Structure formats: structure tokens, C-alpha cells
Amino acid sequence: QMNMKTRPSRILSLFKKGTIGTVQKINLADPRVIEIAALSGVDAVWLCNEHVPNDWLGLEGQIRAARIHDIDTLVRVSRGSYSDYIRPLEADATGIIVPHVTTSDEARQIVSWVRFHPHGKRALDGGNADGQYCHLPIDEYIRHSNEERLIILQIESPEAMENLNEIAAVPGINGLMFGPGDYSHRIGKPGQHMVEEVAMARK
């Protein structure tokens, strides 16, 4: 019988140690760019389905390139149906970044879509890269997906800042990420990332 091994998250391991990882944002679809980033020493690459015209096959190739070099892949998803959230994970991304989260109810809905039982109601397949094409035992697949896959929420508006503590308290969330571009836009100062209101929110 084959001994199927799962890959732990580098970023999550660093989180648990209280240290900071390096993440490189990549807007190019060529998987060789991912390999170059990995060889430069980063811990993870950040790919984007919100603003970048990635297709699913191309994204899968980028994730595979990262996996070859043992670095994490974080995919910023499009806001949409549950499949927009789980397909990067099924392609074996290490985690997702969900933009424009404003309330704890939204955060709980995201967890429900992305986590498996007993933490959520994610649709169960296992026949993709993250389940090693049905070679990974189902209990190990569920455990690994729940424990080693990240959910990071972007805080990008004054409304989200008002609800920050409630959002952060939702079980199943691994981290919050501030979005200065949209935050500056929402306060009527688009692109002014260094003004006091944005700087204070970033803290």
C-alpha cells in the first residue's frame, strides 16, 4: 500500500511559533515565476482570483510549482458561490484570502463553506489534488484540510473595522489582513495609503 504524505503549511507553522513568514504577491500566470520566487527564499506566494484573470488550469499549475519547492500558496478568491472558495483548496492551495469581509456572520458563512465536519459543511470530494486523487484516506483528508489549510479574511472598510473583534473571534479563522487600497477608497481618499486614518486602521 502506498504511503501517502500530506504537506504541512509553512505559514501556519510560523504563525504557531509567533514568527513572521515572507509572502510574495504574484500577478503573472507563468508557473516559472512561482519557481523563481520560491528559489529566492519566500515562504509563500499570494495568487489572485479577484483582480487577475487567472483560469483554473493555470492556477493549478502555479500551485503545483509552489508545491514542488515546498512553499505555501495563498489564493485571494473572488467573492461568489462556495465553489469559488473551495476550488483553490481542491487544487491544493495552502489557503485562501477572502476579500471585503465586513461582519462576523460573513466570517461564519465562509468557515461553514470551507471547513469540513465538525467545523463546517464544505462539499466533500477528495478526487482532486488536495485529496491526492482519492488515494488519501478520507479521515486524513478531512483532518489535514481542517488543520493545515488557512482562511485569511481581508478587512477593507470602516464597517469591517467596527466589527473587527467579532470577526476575529469566529472559530476557524487563521488570520486577518488589512487592505489599504480599498480602505482608503471607502473613506474618500483613494490611493492615499499613508494618511493618518489608514495608518491608524492598519495598526
Q: Could you tell me what each predicted segment is?
A:
Residues 15-31, 74-78, 149-162:
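Active-site mouth loops of central-metabolism enzymes
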Residues 24, 37, 48, 96, ...:
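Conserved, mostly hydrophobic/aromatic
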Residues 26-40, 79-87, 159-170:
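Short, acidic/polar
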Residues 56-82, 86, 90, 112-120, ...:
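Alpha-helix-loop-beta-strand connector modules within alpha/beta enzyme cores
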Residues 83, 95-171, 185:
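Conserved anion-binding
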